[in-house]
């Protein structure tokens, strides 16, 4: 019976761990008086359903939980291809707003997160995200 060198086994395990587990994605931007953070557990996104979340915080860092959060995610038109454009409402879960994005193809996508609070001006944050 052949023995597999320990070093080779360690390299194979390291490669499987590094490439088998997708890293998350988190990007924070400021829109008006709000800090809006888009989070993805699995990044890059995959073709099909993806779960994302949005955290909205005011200038003092307190979570905003009384807003209506809508998300537009889209791929701009390219030569020979029409644009793809989708809209969804995020649902409050704890102190974050969650939504599902069904991405039909790989490539560069854009997301616009719009936050509307009672008695306050609307705020929109823009993000670039990739799908593979």
Placement of each model-derived feature along the sequence:
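Contiguous segments within soluble domain cores/interaction surfaces
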Residues: 21-132
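Sec-dependent bacterial lipoprotein signal peptides
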Residues: 1-19
């Amino acid at each position: 019976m052949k023995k597999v060198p320990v070093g080779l086994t360690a390299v194979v395990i390291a490669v499987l761990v590094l490439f088998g587990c997708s890293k998350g994605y988190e990007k924070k931007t400021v829109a008006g008086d709000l800090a809006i953070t888009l989070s993805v557990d699995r990044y890059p996104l995959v073709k099909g359903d993806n779960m994302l979340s949005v955290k909205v915080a005011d200038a003092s860092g307190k979570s905003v939980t009384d807003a209506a959060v809508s998300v537009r995610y889209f791929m701009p038109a390219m030569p020979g291809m029409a644009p793809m454009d989708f809209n969804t409402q995020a649902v409050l879960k704890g102190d974050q707003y969650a939504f599902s994005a069904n991405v039909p193809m790989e490539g560069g996508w854009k997301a616009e997160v719009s936050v509307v609070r009672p008695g306050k001006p609307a705020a929109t944050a823009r993000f670039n995200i990739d799908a593979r």
